[in-house]
């Protein structure tokens, strides 16, 4: 079953096959894509479209609002589709806000000051303005609200979670914020059970075979929600038992047999890795007997060979090239080295820069 899990997940995660031509379609299929590492998250999307797209092309989609980046789960930034942002926030934001309560108290952010901060944001951003965090910090200061460091960050996160603001276009390397009401046209709202069923459906379609524990880890929702959600959509899914755990996946899935060996240079927060509480299925070469060695190899991005983690990689960008450094957990065969070289060529095409290995 472990090998089946790998084959199904590579297929469902759009790594061994894909029908999508646009990065935004990938975001919608996956439901949400972790993106605090913006550069890595763009590469995660690029690997899941039919034809090689470029870093600049995804920047363009992001700046045009075809892909949004906001706090929605766990809590960290995720890429989400504009049509999904409101029902996702309705479903997941209350849990994140509850988890943030300690920091709100520590930073003296009570309901009154948070409401006042929303008024400041609405006034500063109305008229389709898009401002950086530092510019909005200045707006808070003018309004007599202390907002520096963590305090500013939690003001902004709360406003994202409550659907006041979302991502705007980047200004150079800086992110901006926009009013959600102006950035994203309203669509017919979903009821909570409809939203729950939709999130569960997308999770197990795009990440199955997976367990309910995997879903609760990824979504931040409760086990009660997970069980209710699977009941709502289970006619479209099947489950198989492994080690006394039920693994759910779409009934219609027919995974392809990927050419072996096949390599993937995945970013550190790729959904193939971070989308599961239990990552043991892809970590057969990660030995618990050598934690220091594992840490050195895996403290950046991860190298996948035929679905298994075989090492880690880092990148250093210059104007004329991208320098890649790798740390392996196992020696690669010649055919695996060639597979890795092909993947590096894809990365080169994505960045529009030559790749050099250290």
Q: Where are the predicted features?
A:
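A short, conserved structural fragment
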Residues: 63-72, 76, 160-170, 234-242, ...
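Short amphipathic alpha-helical interaction segments
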Residues: 52-60, 146-158, 223-230
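Glycine-rich, small/acidic residue-mixed loop/short-helix segments
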Residues: 285, 292-358
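Short, cationic-aromatic polyanion-contact patches
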Residues: 79-85, 171-190, 247-257
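Non-catalytic regulatory appendages
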Residues: 236-288
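Positively charged, polyanion-binding regions of nucleic-acid-associated proteins
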Residues: 112-129, 192-208, 230
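Phosphate-backbone binding and catalysis cores of DNA-processing enzymes
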Residues: 1-134, 138-148
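Active-site-proximal binding-pocket segments
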Residues: 196-251
């Amino acid at each position: 079953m472990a090998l089946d899990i790998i084959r199904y997940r590579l297929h469902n995660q759009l790594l061994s096959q894909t029908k999508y031509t646009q990065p935004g379609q990938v975001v919608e299929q996956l439901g949400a894509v972790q993106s605090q590492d913006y550069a890595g998250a763009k590469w995660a999307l690029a690997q899941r479209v039919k034809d090689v797209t470029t870093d600049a092309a995804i920047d363009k989609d992001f700046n045009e609002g075809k892909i949004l980046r906001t706090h929605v789960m766990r809590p960290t930034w995720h890429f989400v589709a504009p049509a999904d942002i409101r029902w996702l926030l309705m479903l997941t934001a209350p849990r994140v806000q509850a988890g943030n309560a300690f920091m709100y108290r520590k930073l003296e952010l009570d309901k009154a000051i948070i409401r006042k901060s929303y008024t400041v944001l609405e006034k500063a951003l109305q008229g389709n303005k898009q401002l950086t965090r530092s510019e909005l910090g200045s707006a808070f200061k003018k309004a007599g609200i202390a907002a520096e460091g963590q305090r500013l960050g939690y003001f902004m996160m709360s406003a994202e979670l409550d659907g006041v603001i979302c991502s705007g276009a980047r200004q150079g390397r800086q992110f901006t914020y926009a009013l959600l009401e102006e950035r994203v046209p309203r669509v017919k709202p979903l009821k909570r059970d409809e939203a729950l069923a939709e999130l569960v459906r997308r999770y197990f379609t795009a990440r199955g075979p997976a367990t309910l524990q995997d879903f609760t880890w990824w979504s931040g929702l409760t086990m009660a929600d997970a069980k209710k959600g699977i009941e709502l959509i289970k006619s479209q899914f099947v489950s198989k038992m492994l080690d006394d755990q039920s693994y759910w996946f779409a009934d219609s899935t027919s995974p392809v047999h990927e050419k072996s060996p096949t390599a993937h240079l995945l970013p550190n927060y790729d959904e193939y890795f971070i989308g599961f509480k239990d990552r043991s299925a892809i970590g057969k070469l990660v030995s618990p007997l050598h934690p220091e060695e594992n840490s050195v190899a895996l403290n950046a991005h991860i190298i996948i060979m035929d679905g298994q983690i075989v090492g880690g990689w880092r990148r250093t960008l210059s104007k004329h090239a991208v320098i890649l450094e790798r740390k392996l957990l196992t020696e690669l065969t010649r055919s695996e080295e060639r597979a890795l070289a092909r993947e590096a060529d894809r990365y080169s095409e994505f960045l529009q820069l030559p790749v050099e290995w250290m």
